[in-house]
A protein has these predicted regions:
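Surface-exposed charge patches
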Residues: 9, 37, 149
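Phosphate-binding site of ATP-dependent enzymes
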Residues: 76-155, 164-167
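Helix N-cap/coil-helix junction residues
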Residues: 44, 156-157
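Active-site nucleotide/adenylate-binding loops and adjacent lid/helix of ATP-dependent enzymes
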Residues: 23-101, 111-116, 141
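A structural supersecondary motif
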Residues: 159-161
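A short, flexible beta-alpha/helix-coil linker loop
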Residues: 19, 65-67, 127-130
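A short, GP-enriched loop/loop-strand-helix hinge that lies immediately N-terminal to
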Residues: 1-30, 45-48
Length: 167
């Protein structure tokens, strides 16, 4: 998406209209610290941050710029908080959301050129491979209304965006 957004004018000069969000939105979403701020600003709760030097357990750590489920850590106690995890320069630390208590969803949202959401498709994550859903259930549920109320209009957002949520 970043390459498409950076070259949007080049595409348009050649008669191609890429359905891609504006560059500032894409750049912000590439850093999970910004994504949390964005979601909070739209009344969507995110896991609480955890101070890695004064942690509460269990906690979850992941790279702020990560993808493909790489370098993800569930730390259940002090003995599991290794120096490798503590000193990893890109990890952010947050409260752990127990998948036994909450279901995890990937939600695809499609935005038109008017920056309004046109479709919201929640998929329950059953089996994951390399960070992507391998098995899932598409379910219309409360998330459709919840997200429509909060993210119906997003200036600069066009095409598909994807959000992972617990519900």
């Amino acid at each position: 998406l970043l390459v498409l957004a950076e070259n949007k004018e080049l595409f348009q000069e050649n008669g191609i209209e890429p359905m891609v969000s504006e560059l500032p939105f894409i750049q912000a979403c590439r850093d999970k610290r910004n994504t949390g701020t964005f979601l909070n600003s739209h009344d969507i709760r995110v896991p609480a941050p955890v101070d890695k030097y004064h942690p509460t357990f269990p906690l979850f750590a992941k790279p702020y710029d990560g993808s493909l489920s790489k370098d993800l850590y569930v730390v259940r106690g002090k003995e599991e908080l290794t120096s490798e995890i503590l000193n990893h320069p890109k990890l952010i630390f947050m409260e752990y959301i127990d998948k036994q208590e909450y279901k995890e969803f990937t939600v695809d949202m499609y935005y038109g050129k008017d920056n309004r959401v046109k479709a919201i498709v929640p998929r329950e994550r059953i089996e994951i491979r390399a960070g992507e859903i391998n098995k899932g259930f598409t379910r219309k549920n409360y998330l459709v209304r919840f997200l429509k109320e909060r993210l119906d209009y997003l200036p600069g957002v066009v095409g598909c965006i994807c959000i992972q949520l617990f519900y």
